[in-house]
Amino acid sequence: MKNLYIDFDGVILDTMEKTYKELEESGIDKKDHDAVTKYFRELDWEKLISETKEINNSIEEIKKICASKKFNVYILTHINSTNEMVQKISYLHKVLPEVTVVSVPKELSKTTVVNPCGAILIDDYSGNVKEWQKGLGIGIKFVKERENGDFPEITHLSEIINMFN
């Protein structure tokens, strides 16, 4: 079985759309690294997670992947604070108790914490997918609608089942 790592923000829940809108409404420039970091560290993650919608039925899609018995499934998520980590783990253990959560401090690359070689990453951020591939991993871009970009793309997580036999 291959190891399959699935990103959280922008793949499972649409937290990025909601937080980017709030950043804009607050007048915080997304290019101001310190201000953005402060915003994410002080964010009420419990509230955000409870108010944010799943993307393309992601929880059921992950359950289908687990049921296929083709992959060792992990959630691999960047975090800005301990509170963010606790809230994500708490949420995921309620809805996907069979899946292990790997939290990565935002200052580190996902490839620093997890060896990508031969493993699959599904992520909405092209930078993470590209870095994963550099580490000899299989990077797949999650998109809400097909972009026909530089990476293999999926719009529903369970599409991964038929990509690997």
Show the residue positions of the predicted features.
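Acidic, Mg2+-coordinating phosphoryl-transfer loop and its flanking beta/alpha structural elements
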Residues: 120-155
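Substrate-recognition element of Asp-dependent hydrolases with the DxDx(T/V) motif
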Residues: 49-54, 58-92
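A short, structured active-site edge motif that brings together acidic residues
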Residues: 74-81, 89, 95-112
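Structural recognition of alpha->loop->beta junctions
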Residues: 91-103, 151-165
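Active-site neighborhood of HAD-like aspartate-dependent phosphohydrolases
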Residues: 1-46
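A structural signal for isolated positions on well-ordered beta-strands in alpha/beta enzyme cores
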Residues: 72-74, 102, 120, 140
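Conserved Lys-Pro-Asp/Glu-containing loop-to-beta segment of HAD-superfamily phosphomonoesterases
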Residues: 3, 104-132
